């Protein structure tokens, strides 16, 4: 099995923590580094959350802090979903893990420039780090094997009727990424909302056990509460983890090639990913957009990763 070399760019975040847990453990993934961006909460909080997850699960991967603000717009956070810390729910031991001194954008540029074009970027938060790296050093573009991102929707948004949170948090950054010419795979809400974590799924991961089973339970029990309060849903989607699922086995997720454009005009559609599902514009597709996911396969994959953290000695 080929190991996919990835840099996971995230804004932890409950579903981000599940993505970190999966990416660090599955044998099909070679997690080179974790870069942190502001998004679900401010950068100081998302950085601590990422370090806490790595410390709890003994994930020995370097963590880099990146962009604390969007490129242009005023900052927004998703405290209604992720709480005051950005990862409310779990209780962590005192933090001793530290971030690297290098800025995440510099790390992304340096790592790509030194590579053979075999590294995939996996941004599951706002695209600020990726866009700034592209603008600072355009020579990285041909070095990126693929970008597999969580964001957008070809249907309805979740932060506004038009826009999904990650794109709405920095639409200008998303515009840079979607016009970059790099091969893109987009896991939008239409797909990620199919991965609804119900109490049955939580109980399954608790039975699987180990530190990751405990963390999954603490994280998703909080998510169930906020999803019900905000959207009336009886479960919480694990949006970001779908990107890791796709990288492990793309056959579990059906995609359709579309031309996708990000609306950066101020107005009710600001931050919308306009997906030409029917091909009416006649423009060449620039994105593989996730349509459906085999949920039985997906939860089996999550459980496999959870079990990977159980110590056998």
From Swiss-Prot:
Catalyzed reactions: a pyrimidine ribonucleoside + H2O = a pyrimidine nucleobase + D-ribose
MF-aspect GO terms: calcium ion binding; purine nucleosidase activity; uridine nucleosidase activity
Disulfide bonds: none
Keyword check for Calcium: yes
Catalytic residues of the enzyme: 11 (proton acceptor)
CDD domains given in the database record: nuc_hydro_IU_UC_XIUA (cd02651)
Similarity field: Belongs to the IUNH family. RihB subfamily.
Function: Hydrolyzes cytidine or uridine to ribose and cytosine or uracil, respectively. Has a clear preference for cytidine over uridine. Strictly specific for ribonucleosides.
Name of the protein: Pyrimidine-specific ribonucleoside hydrolase RihB
Annotated source species: Escherichia coli O1:K1 / APEC
Classification lineage: Bacteria, Pseudomonadati, Pseudomonadota, Gammaproteobacteria, Enterobacterales
